[in-house]
């Protein structure tokens, strides 16, 4: 074989090797720079990315995936419900490989968009959209809210406990109901008004801090000294009102939701007993990872609770909540995880709930 032919064959082998080195991996990314980056899109509800709660947690999960898998990411904030479908359309048009809709209010928009774009993968949080290209993530909020109720029931001195919800509907009712069941389990006297909804306020908003402040003031005027919220940005207003009351010499406490709000709102850490951790970030991270790994399962619904590690209490709880109370919370948490306690999730179930004492 002559030298020219040997040289040509060698060059071909090298070129082939280099080309193979740039071949795409299963996740759509390429080794060596010839990359088709997976793109992730997300639209919030009107609470916005910086609600220090639900939407921010969703955003955190995708940012973790960005760091680990080097995916592209584009979030869009909705200002009103009218933005939902157009935001989803825009994310599809931008080339997103998976689009997340954050919140039950987007069910109708997601249903319409999933039909329009059958080849695009979608995920929605807090409701079920039964479409072959949509995975639905739901949480057992009542379980974590029950634990917050145990804390509230043990910490109240007035035996009056309040709840502020974003909107009076099935999802947010799960927070209210679980919370009332937890209070009733450790302090039945403090649960009476809560169960009768005498100390329950729905702001009909997830973003108006003024409404949260007004609601908290009204509850404190009724004698409530512990208030739990499931209202997104409205909860910031609740904390503002409680802080002002604390500054005026009143012993009043707030309980946060979705993220550790003593961390996301450090200026109110001194008046927060605990927060119910709802790992929305786990759902958005796992949803993104499923696309990266090629394991996306559309047409499925995933339910996440204490047993799945997606519901918990804030790690900062020990700052303002005594150890004996937190020890009791852990016992209830174990009982729920082991199936010894089934926490009610509807107002009707709450009526027939029989408290279970753990020791």
Over which residues does each language-model region extend?
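Repetitive helical segments and hydrophobic/amphipathic motifs
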Residues: 12-13
